[in-house]
Design a protein with these regions (language model features):
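N-terminal Rossmann-like FAD-binding beta1-loop-alpha1 element of flavoenzymes
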Residues: 24-49
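Long, amphipathic alpha-helical stalk/connector segments used for oligomerization, subunit docking
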Residues: 478-557
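Extreme N-terminal leader/targeting segments of oxidoreductases
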Residues: 1-24
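Core beta-strand elements of the Rossmann-like FAD/NAD(P) dinucleotide-binding domain
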Residues: 19-22, 205-215, 442
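Mobile, glycine/GP-rich and aromatic-enriched active-site lid/loop segments adjacent to catalytic centers
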Residues: 109, 117-183, 188-194, 261-454, ...
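Glycine-rich loop(s) and the adjacent beta-strand/alpha-helix scaffold that form part
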Residues: 218-279, 459-473
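Conserved beta-strand-loop-beta-strand element in the redox core of flavoprotein oxidoreductases
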Residues: 186-209, 216
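Glycine-rich FAD pyrophosphate-binding loop
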Residues: 42-62
Length: 648
C-alpha cells in the first residue's frame, strides 16, 4: 500500500471481521432499499440494510424527486392500473417489465401514503396553490403533466429519504452505513447456488463485514460510467450519482444471475462535461413541462397536440387531445412517438428552423401563468434530484428571477448538451435482472427491486417494487431453515477485497474506468457487429487480467472506488454479451447491428436473456408477455397483502 498524502482520519481495521445474521438482507439503502426493508419488517422478518453511503441522502433519488409517477390508485386518478400498465407496455412495443410496472401502478399510491405517514410531504398543506387547475382542493394533491387524468403527483421529494429511513427504522430494520456490499455468498460456495448472504467492506475503516441471510434483496440502482467518464470531473460523469456503478449487476452475474435488455443503451443526454447541469438549462420537458419556449428573437415556439393542432393556451398543454383518453409523460413514455399516447409538445427543432425561427432557444417562465411558474420554479426544480442546491439555490443567489429572466437552451434544441453517437448511457427503461412474480431472480434466495430490475424507472417504481420484493423475500425466509456459509468462499472474497493494498503505485481506479469507456465506445457504440463485439470482450478481458490486477489502494476509500470500477468492468462485459446474443437490430431498443440490419424481425421480438455458465455464457429467448395475465397473477401472489389492506 502506498502512503496517503494526508493522514487517514479513521482507525484502520483491515484485519477485523464483523459477522452478522438476519432473515432478509437488503443491499442498497436508496428508495427501493428503504422500502424493501419496510416491506420485509411488515412481514415479520429481521432485516439488515447494507448501504455504502449515508442512507439519509443515498441512492439515485437521495437528493430528491419532483413527482411520483403512475399512482393509478390515488383518489383523483381517472386511469386504472390495468389501463396504465397496458399503455406503458405498448409504448415500448412490448419491451417492458409488465410485472414491475403493474406493481408500480397498483401499489405506488400505498407507498406514497407510507412516506406521508413517516412525515414526507406529498400535499400542498401550506395552501400555496389554492385554485390552481393542477390542484385537487379536497385532497390538496398537486398533479403534473396530464391535469385531466391525474395519475402523476407533484411531491416535495426533498423530504422523502428522511421519511423512508424513519419509517424503516421504526419498523425495526438495522442499517449498516458506509459499508459496500462486494460479493454474494452461495450455499456450499457453488456457482448458481442458493444465495445465503454477502460480504462487504467499510469505506472508512476497511473492516470486512460478513452477513448470513436466508434471503437477499438487490437494490443498488442501474449502472453508470460504462461509456462516459471524465477523470478530471468524475462527479458529473453521468446523469445519475456516480456511485451507482451496477453493484448488484456485477455481484449477481459472478454467481450466475440472468439479465435481459442490457443491449439497450441510448445516445447520452445531460451528462459529463459536454452537458450543462440537468434541468439547469432552458427546456420544456420533465421538471420544466410545459414551459413556454421562445427563439432568439423572442418569438414564442408553438405547442401542438398529437394531431398537429396548435394549442392557444398554456392550460391546453396539460390536457389530452380531443378523443384521447390520456397521454404519458414524466416516466414510462415512449422514446419514439406512439399516436394514442403522445402528449402535447413544441414544434420539432428542424421544423422550427424551416419556418424561420432562430437559435438559440430559451425557456421563458415569465410568460407562464403565475401558479405554473411557481410550481415549476419551486416545487419541481426545488425538489428534483441534484436541483435544489446547484440550480435553485445557485441561480437564485446569482440573481435569476423566473418572473423576469429566461434560460438558454444548449445542444440539440431544448436539450442541455450534445453528444457523439458512440457516447451511450442507460436512460429511460434500460436492461437489468430478470424477475418472476415474486421479483425473484433465477437464483434461489435472491430478489431484486428498483433499478436493479430490467425496464425500471423512477421513484414510485423503486418504492413499489422495493416493498413488494421485501415482503416476498420475508415470506421465503420464513419457509427455509438456517443457512450455512462456505468459509473458503468467504476467505476468497476477503482476499480479493484487500489485494490492491499490496500493489505498488501502478494503476488508479480512475485510469481503469476511463479505459473501460474507451473500449465500450470503440467496440460497443452506436453500431455493432460480431467482430467488433468479440474484440470488445477480448479487450475487456485484457483489462481485467492486466490493468485490474495492478490497481493500487492507499486507504479504505480507494478500496471502495476500486470495487466500483471492477463492477463497471463486469457490467460492461454483460452488456457486450447481451449485444452479441441479439442477432437483429431493434428500433425500440436503440440497437443497431450492421451485420444484422433487419429492424425487429418477428422471430426477434422477444426478450433475449443472458447468464454466465461455468463454461461461458448462455442465452435464451423469452416471450415479451411471459408474465401472463397481470391482474390475475398479481392477485394470486399477493392474497395476504390484499387481505391486510381490506382490513385497514
Amino acid at each position: 500500500m502506498i502512503p496517503s498524502p494526508v493522514p487517514w482520519p479513521y482507525p484502520i481495521e483491515f484485519d477485523q471481521v464483523e459477522r452478522l445474521d438476519t432473515d432478509v438482507l437488503v443491499l442498497g439503502g436508496g428508495a427501493a432499499g428503504c422500502m424493501a426493508a419496510s416491506g420485509a419488517c411488515d412481514a415479520g422478518a429481521r432485516v439488515i440494510v447494507l448501504e455504502k453511503a449515508a442512507t439519509i441522502a443515498s441512492g439515485a433519488s437521495g437528493s430528491g424527486s419532483d413527482h411520483w409517477e403512475s399512482a393509478a390508485t390515488n383518489p383523483c386518478s381517472k386511469v386504472i392500473p390495468e389501463e396504465l400498465v397496458d399503455a406503458m407496455i405498448r409504448a415500448h412495443d412490448g419491451f417492458n417489465n409488465g410485472i414491475s410496472h403493474y406493481i408500480e401502478c397498483r401499489e405506488g399510491w400505498d407507498r406514497l401514503l407510507d412516506i406521508e405517514a413517516a412525515r414526507g410531504k406529498i400535499r400542498d398543506t401550506d395552501d400555496q396553490f389554492v385554485g390552481a387547475e393542477f390542484r385537487d382542493e379536497k385532497t390538496k394533491l398537486l398533479f403534473a403533466y396530464d391535469y385531466e387524468n391525474r395519475f402523476n403527483i407533484r411531491v416535495w421529494g426533498q423530504t422523502f429519504k428522511h421519511a423512508q429511513l424513519r419509517g424503516a427504522k421504526r419498523r425495526g430494520a438495522k442499517f449498516i452505513e458506509r459499508t459496500m456490499a462486494t460479493g454474494l455468498l452461495t450455499e456450499g460456495g457453488r456457482f448458481g447456488g442458493r444465495v445465503v448472504g454477502a460480504v462487504g467492506i467499510n469505506g472508512r475503516t476497511g473492516k470486512c463485514v460478513v452477513i448470513r441471510a436466508k434471503a437477499t434483496v438487490l437494490c443498488t440502482s442501474r449502472p453508470t460510467r460504462i461509456w462516459l467518464f471524465t477523470i478530471g470531473a468524475p462527479g458529473i460523469s453521468e446523469f445519475r450519482p456516480p456511485q451507482c456503478t451496477g453493484d448488484a449487476h456485477a455481484m449477481s452475474w459472478r454467481i450466475g444471475a440472468e439479465f435481459t435488455m442490457l443491449e439497450k443503451a441510448i445516445k447520452a443526454e445531460w451528462s459529463g462535461t459536454r452537458s450543462f447541469p440537468p434541468y439547469g438549462a432552458g427546456n420544456n420537458h420533465n421538471s420544466w413541462y410545459a414551459c413556454t419556449m421562445v427563439d432568439a428573437e423572442g418569438r414564442e415556439i408553438p405547442w401542438l397536440d398529437r394531431d398537429g393542432r396548435e394549442l392557444a393556451t398554456v392550460s391546453e398543454r396539460y390536457r389530452p387531445a380531443p378523443g384521447q383518453k390520456f397521454f404519458l409523460k414524466g416516466g414510462g413514455e415512449p422514446d419514439f412517438p406512439v399516436y394514442e399516447l403522445t402528449g402535447p409538445e413544441t414544434l420539432p427543432v428542424d421544423e422550427l428552423l424551416k419556418r424561420g425561427y432562430k437559435l438559440p432557444l430559451y425557456a421563458d417562465l415569465s410568460r407562464m401563468p403565475e401558479m405554473e411558474r411557481r410550481v415549476i420554479w419551486g416545487v419541481m426544480i426545488g425538489n428534483e434530484g441534484k436541483m435544489k442546491i446547484p440550480i435553485m439555490q445557485a441561480y437564485t443567489q446569482a440573481g435569476f428571477d423566473p418572473a423576469k429572466h429566461m434560460l438558454q437552451s444548449y445542444g440539440d434544441g431544448w436539450k442541455s448538451g450534445a453528444f457523439l453517437p458512440q457516447e451511450r448511457q442507460f436512460f429511460g427503461l434500460p436492461g437489468g435482472l430478470m424477475n418472476d412474480w415474486h421479483l425473484r431472480t433465477n437464483l434461489e434466495g435472491l430478489y431484486a427491486a428498483g433499478d436493479a430490475l430490467f425496464a425500471s424507472n423512477c421513484y414510485g417504481h423503486a418504492c413499489a417494487t422495493g416493498h413488494y420484493a421485501g415482503r416476498h423475500a420475508a415470506r421465503y425466509a420464513k419457509q427455509v431453515g438456517d443457512v450455512a456459509l462456505h468459509e473458503p468462499q468467504v476467505e476468497e472474497q476477503r482476499a480479493r477485497l484487500y489485494r490492491p493494498l499490496g500493489n505498488e503505485k501502478e494503476v488508479t481506479w480512475q485510469e481503469l474506468n476511463f479505459a473501460i469507456t474507451r473500449v465500450m465506445q470503440h467496440h460497443c457504440g452506436a453500431f455493432k457487429t460480431d467482430q467488433l463485439l468479440v474484440r470488445g470482450i477480448a479487450a475487456l478481458d485484457e483489462l481485467e487480467r492486466q490493468e485490474a490486477s495492478r490497481l493500487v489502494a492507499r486507504n479504505p476509500h480507494d478500496l471502495i472506488r476500486i470495487q466500483e470500477v471492477l463492477n463497471i468492468l463486469t457490467t460492461a462485459t454483460i452488456v457486450v454479451h447481451s449485444c452479441l446474443a441479439r442477432k437483429a437490430s431493434s428500433k425500440t431498443l436503440h440497437f443497431s447491428r450492421l451485420d444484422y440490419p433487419g429492424i425487429d424481425p418477428p422471430e426477434w421480438r422477444q426478450f433475449v436473456a443472458v447468464r454466465p455458465t461455468e463454461g461461458g455464457v448462455a442465452s435464451r429467448q423469452i416471450p415479451l408477455d411471459y408474465y401472463g395475465d397481470l391482474p390475475d397473477n398479481y392477485q394470486r401472489e399477493n392474497r395476504d397483502y390484499l387481505e391486510a389492506r381490506r382490513k385497514r
